[in-house]
Amino acid sequence: MIVLVNNRDSFVWNLAEYASLFDRVKVVPNTITVGELRRLDPDGVIISPGPGHPLERREVGNSPEIVLEAGVPILGVCLGHQIIATAFGGKVGRVKPRHGKASPVKHDGKGVLRGIKNPLTAGRYHSLAVLEVPREFDVSAVSLDDNVVMGIRHRKLPIEGLQFHPESVLTEWERKEGLRIIKNFVEMSRNG
């Protein structure tokens, strides 16, 4: 089962729909505790997009603790990606707003990006981005039009973040590349 932590974004249900094609999905509020989450015994956790700043507790709930303590594979999308970065000591700041914009994204073809078109046209909906990557992470993807970090991956733990939205129609819809990214995460979660 995949647990999707809901940070109150309109894209939450698109992510849930994508993931449900490959496994059972339970959507939970971001106020769920790590203990409550562990009792659900998920194979993996998706930290959803949402409005606001990753350091604003009222907007992200217990998402940072989940990232650090859940002990299962984690994928963060947009705000979820930023939460991963800040939870591990990275910095997030303002960038030129990219709401409803598609950008070419070059990636390393590993992890959730395995087998994905490169460069990938990806849907972006953000005005914040990771400016300093935590030292335990590698940059896995970068936008080619403005050189913004679009993906990070922990060097040892199964934790990845994507600034772009794989569930957006702007992300290679015809080729189903966003769907493949979510499938890769579900498979990675099942395999531990």
Curated annotation (Swiss-Prot):
InterPro entries, A to Z: Anth_synth/Amidotransfase (IPR050472), Class_I_gatase-like (IPR029062), GATASE (IPR017926), TrpG/PapA_dom (IPR006221)
EC number in record: 4.1.3.27
Protein's pathway: Amino-acid biosynthesis; L-tryptophan biosynthesis; L-tryptophan from chorismate: step 1/5
Active site (record annotation): C78 (nucleophile), H165 (for gatase activity), E167 (for gatase activity)
UniProt GO MF annotations: anthranilate synthase activity
Subunit structure: Heterotetramer consisting of two non-identical subunits: a beta subunit (TrpG) and a large alpha subunit (TrpE).
Protein's name in the database: Anthranilate synthase component 2
Species whose genome carries this gene: Thermococcus kodakarensis (strain ATCC BAA-918 / JCM 12380 / KOD1)
Gene this protein is translated from: trpG
